[in-house]
Amino acid sequence: MIIRTPHLDYYESLQTQWLVYIISIGDTMYQINQLSFSYEKKEVLKNISITFPNNKITAIIGPNGCGKSTLLSHLYRLLPSKDKITLNQKPLESYKGREFAQLVAVLTQSRDSMIDDFLVKDIVLMGRYPYKQHFGTYSADDVKIA
């Protein structure tokens, strides 16, 4: 599963990010069941239920403040989902760090991102990080694939 929030030229003139892509690869599938979330008293997500099917691209479109980033924060566990989100039919909170990292990668694109300091090969290799052992190096196969 790769989640990315592209900064499109057309929307740059509006100085906002309106579009979120959720790309599901292989058998990885997210399912959300009646997720609600509030920042203090402001309700941002209200009873959201959606399935992001495997091998599909899902676009979430909306203006600033409608909950796109909040939804993503739940999907990659920056905010608690209280068993309202499953990944491959297993509650999101039940995944251990490395196991979750092997299933989900997040790539954001924005002007202030430090991603500009990396080569494409470096970014691709970052996706292999959860498979390395502590203080390990990338295998020859990892480097060849990248």
Region spans (language model):
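Conserved A-loop
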Residues: 37, 47-52
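Helix-to-loop junction immediately C-terminal to a conserved catalytic motif
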Residues: 75-76
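Conserved structural motif at the start of ABC-family nucleotide-binding domains
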Residues: 30-32, 43-47
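ABC nucleotide-binding domain signature
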Residues: 59, 98-110, 117, 121-125
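Short coil-to-beta microelement around the adenine-binding A-loop and adjacent beta1/P-loop entry
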Residues: 42-43, 98
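ABC-family P-loop ATPase nucleotide-binding domains
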Residues: 113-146
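The feature captures the beta-strand-to-loop junction immediately N-terminal to the Walker
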Residues: 61-63
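Conserved ABC transporter NBD signature motif
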Residues: 83-93, 100
